[in-house]
Curated annotation (Swiss-Prot):
Primary gene name: AXIN1
UniProt feature, compositional bias: Low complexity: 325-339
The protein's name in its UniProt record: Axin-1
Modified residues (Phosphothreonine): 481
Job description of the protein: Component of the beta-catenin destruction complex required for regulating CTNNB1 levels through phosphorylation and ubiquitination, and modulating Wnt-signaling. Controls dorsoventral patterning via two opposing effects; down-regulates CTNNB1 to inhibit the Wnt signaling pathway and ventralize embryos, but also dorsalizes embryos by activating a Wnt-independent JNK signaling pathway. In Wnt signaling, probably facilitates the phosphorylation of CTNNB1 and APC by GSK3B. Likely to function as a tumor suppressor.
Cellular component annotations (GO), alphabetically ordered: beta-catenin destruction complex; cell cortex; cell periphery; cytoplasm; cytoplasmic vesicle; cytosol; lateral plasma membrane; microtubule cytoskeleton
């Protein structure tokens, strides 16, 4: 091996003179200039051999045997040697430049001994075995063994097998020197390089940089020597000159002398930060087969130097040039001495275009200087933390209050909806609405007149509150008086004008809340107004009249004012004197006070009303107590009779009785189910304390407790309905009868859903069954069987004798025989729908019955 050391090229910038030779003419870079002591170009040649071939160039090799002295454009050019290095390890080790580059890589990796040992073994094997070389061969074998194998910490010793090391040691100890004694060790080291170091070298930056620059890598120039590259050096360029400095010939002499330790193309220390952005670029590596090519184009280390004959253009110019090349497919890389006009012949067109696109992407990211814009206030204006916190807390509290109000309103509306939904099934619940704040017009005459004033004042105070309090009072009043009649057909809250007129014309205000009042309602209002005036007339002028005379006259006038046209009743309105003498108990005025505010207003107005009274208060006697007890007992007995009558005939829930021509409202039996034929001559109110003001009212229940109880009962009813079909029919019957009741516009809203007893329901079912049996002439011991055959929309219906039908009997009904699957409908609470189709497979199994029928589906088995 003839390897000569190569020094670092001289920097022409340090000793530049006017007599220095000019740069070579484009196309003549490969010519050897004998007068210049320094080489005109620096590159590794691809020649194989030991001698120096300085007159050739790997970029454009000069061939003297051609007519023009070089290859014309369009002619074929040999594959560059650095691409052959990727074929195999032997191709790499057969080239001197490849060996030098590979050794540089191994030095960086700390395993250069592998390559040295491989060449040492090759040289030892080439020594001729003769007597004169015997001693030399022994010394060389011992030197190789001591340097590479004896040291167990060395890379070669670690990669060599123990048996191989023992064999080599035995040969040296016995002095049996054989040319092939290191062949096994060389083979093992070569295998190690092929598996590890050689693939790593092909993927290393040093090899990729070498291929990118066209075999002109600065790293190779500065780190190693090559026999084929001696005598060559990089062309001298002026040193890097800053923008604000002036170049001098003798500047930085010491720095230039010390640049042997660094590549000539490396940036000075002071320019590292200035050129950081252009030097940072990402390199992607591609491999196609055995060929390894470089990734996206990267700017050279020093942007002020010309690299491989290509001058760098500004960023905008480079972008425009690349875009023009991609758009027009023009050739913008033209050189005077190139085989294919600047495009390497070993690249296919597709790869070249892809590389150009990658270059455009990289050049498009050139950092631009900051351009100051017009100053404007930023969007996020800084605010003082304390002021910002106060503003934020204020807004959040407003949002929280809004949400809480919405939640409360929704909760109350939900309660009202629950009451409305439970109105059909719960006889104790009354219809919701603002009209529940006052009892019906005729019922007011059973209160003392001061209670009338108190009720109006309480209503006025209640309507002056916010809507939430109105809604609360409405819910509480509905729960406390579930059976009370609504004041009128209107469901709109009275405005201030209506409220102001209430004490004057109570009957009209009580029944005339809506804009459009029917004629019957007008009659009722007029009657109520007339009767109201009659009461006040007795207040001021007839306090000294006897009680019996007052009662008789009040009864007579109440008959004329009663809008339902019933017979005269015995519990009509009474004079103020009698009302106060009978109903002066402390709890009498509290009967109307359903809420706290109304109660306070009642007490306040009661004191005002008592100031100008001249009537004497009397304590009720024994006859009045007996009369009261008799009324209570009679009311209870009549209620029981009415319930038994409902069970026998169902008259109270049928709603089929036609009213008389002069009746403008629903029958009394529908409004008050407990009112029997004997009691239809008297108006029986819903509560006992209205019948007799001396009776204390019931304690007001807790609304939340009532709601919880209603919800619990509804849940229990749903559970029982899902478990027992009879219970479900019970609830459905109740809801149906509640909806079937006719509600004319002029009549009060129904308070109580007519009761449906189990006995009545069973009687209804029995009658329906008898009716069906009589219509179809179905025998009692037969059952209807209906089935859908193979997805047909219309079922088949037939009669089967017996109540228990098995699957075998059902199969005999089918006209088509085959393999089928049978499903039958049955009641089940397993799913929400309440029914399922159950498959039956055994012929002896009894088919389920659904609503007195057997309903089945026959599906064909595929």
């Amino acid at each position: 091996m003839n390897i000569q050391e190569q020094g670092f090229p001289l920097d022409l910038g340090a000793s530049f003179t006017e007599d220095a030779p000019r740069p070579p003419v484009p196309g003549e870079e490969g010519e050897l200039v004998s007068t210049d002591p320094r080489p005109a170009s620096y590159s590794f040649c691809s020649g194989k051999g030991v001698g120096i071939k300085g007159e050739t160039s790997t970029a454009t090799p000069r061939r003297s045997d051609l007519d023009l002295g070089y290859e014309p454009e369009g002619s074929a050019s040999p594959t560059p040697p650095y691409l052959k290095w990727a074929e195999s390890l032997h191709s790499l080790l057969d080239d001197q430049d490849g060996i030098s580059l590979f050794r540089t890589f191994l030095k960086q990796e700390g395993c250069a001994d592998l390559l040295d040992f491989w060449f040492a073994c090759t040289g030892f094997r080439k020594l001729e075995p003769c007597d004169s070389n015997e001693e030399k061969r022994l010394k060389l074998a011992r030197a190789i063994y001591r340097k590479y194998i004896l040291d167990n910490n060395g890379i070669v010793s670690r990669q060599t097998k123990p048996a191989t090391k023992s064999f080599i040691k035995g040969c040296i100890m016995k002095q049996l020197i054989d040319p092939a004694m290191f062949d096994q060790a060389q083979t093992e080291i070569q295998a190690t390089m092929e598996e590890n170091t050689y693939p790593s070298f092909l993927k290393s930056d040093i090899y990729l940089e070498y291929t990118r620059t066209g075999s002109e890598s600065p790293k190779v120039c500065s780190d190693q020597s090559s026999g084929s590259g001696t005598g060559k050096g990089i062309s001298g360029y002026l040193p890097t000159l800053n923008e604000d400095e002036e170049w001098k010939c003798d500047q930085d002499m010491d720095e230039d002398d010390g640049r042997d330790a660094a590549p000539p193309g490396r940036l000075p220390q002071k320019l590292l930060l200035e050129t950081a952005a252009p030097r940072v670029s990402s390199s992607r590596r591609y491999s196609e087969g055995r060929e390894f090519r470089y990734g996206s184009w990267r700017e050279p280390v020093n942007p002020y130097y010309v690299n491989a004959g290509y001058a760098l253009a500004p960023a905008t110019s480079a972008n425009d040039s690349e875009q023009q090349s991609l758009s027009s497919d023009a050739d913008t890389l033209s050189l005077t001495d190139s085989s294919v006009d600047g495009i390497p012949p070993y690249r296919i067109r597709k790869q070249h275009r892809r590389e150009m696109q990658e270059s455009v992407q990289v050049n498009g990211r050139v950092p631009l200087p900051h351009i100051p814009r017009t100053y404007r206030v930023p969007k996020e204006v800084r605010v003082e933390p304390q002021k910002f916190a106060e503003e934020l807390i204020h807004r959040l509290e407003a949002v929280q209050r809004t949400r809480e109000a919405e939640e409360k309103l929704e909760e109350r509306l939900k309660r009202v909806r629950m009451e409305e939904e439970g109105e059909d099934g719960d006889p104790s619940s009354g219809p919701p609405g603002p009209c529940h704040k006052l009892p019906p017009a005729p019922a007011w005459h059973h209160f003392p007149p001061r209670c009338v004033d108190m009720g109006c004042a309480g209503l006025r105070d209640a309507h002056e509150e916010n809507p939430e309090s109105i809604l609360d009072e409405h819910v509480q009043r509905v729960l406390r008086t579930p059976g009370r009649q609504s004041p009128g057909p209107g469901h709109r809250s009275p405005d201030s004008g209506h409220v102001a007129k209430m004490p004057v014309a109570l009957g009209g205000a009580a029944s005339g809340h809506g804009k459009h009042v029917p004629k019957s309602g007008a009659k009722l209002d007029a009657a109520g107004l007339h009767h109201h005036r009659h009461v006040h007339h007795h207040v001021h002028h007839s306090t000294a009249r006897p009680k019996e005379q007052v009662e008789a006259e009040a009864t007579r006038r109440a008959q004329s004012s009663f809008a339902w046209g019933l017979e005269p009743h015995s519990h009509g309105a009474r004079s103020r004197g009698y009302s106060e003498s009978v109903g002066a108990a402390p709890n009498a005025s509290d009967g109307l006070a359903h809420s706290g505010k109304v109660g306070v207003a009642c007490k306040r107005n009661a004191k005002k009303a008592e100031s100008g009274k001249s009537a004497s208060t009397e304590v009720p006697g024994a006859s009045e107590d007996a009369e009261k007890n008799q009324k209570i007992m009679q009311w209870i007995i009549e209620g029981e009779k009415e319930i038994s009558r409902h069970r026998r005939t169902g008259h109270g829930s049928s709603g089929t009785r036609k009213p008389q021509p002069h009746e403008n409202s629903r029958p009394l039996s529908l409004e008050h189910p407990w009112a029997g034929p004997q009691l239809r001559t008297s108006v029986q109110p819903s509560h006992l304390f209205i019948q007799d003001p001396t009776m204390p009212p019931h304690p007001a229940p807790n609304p939340l407790t009532q709601l919880e109880e209603a919800r619990r009962r509804l849940e229990e009813e749903e559970k029982r309905a899902s478990r027992a079909p009879s219970k479900q029919r019970y609830v459905q019957e109740v809801m149906r009868r509640g909806r079937a009741c006719v509600r004319p516009a002029c009549a009060p809203v129904l308070h109580v859903v007519p009761a449906v007893s189990d006995m009545e329901l069973s009687e209804t079912e029995t009658r329906s069954q008898r009716k069906v049996g009589g219509g179809s002439a179905q025998p009692c011991d037969s059952i209807v069987v209906a089935y859908y055959f193979c997805g047909e929309p219309i079922p088949y219906r037939t009669l089967v004798r017996g109540r228990a039908v098995t699957l075998g009997q059902f199969k005999e009904l089918l006209t088509k025989k085959g393999s089928y699957r049978y499903y039958f409908k049955k009641v089940s609470d397993e799913f929400d729908c309440g029914v399922v189709f159950e498959e039956v497979r055994e012929d002896e199994a009894v088919l389920p019955v659904f609503e007195e029928k057997i309903i089945g589906k026959v599906e064909k088995v595929d």
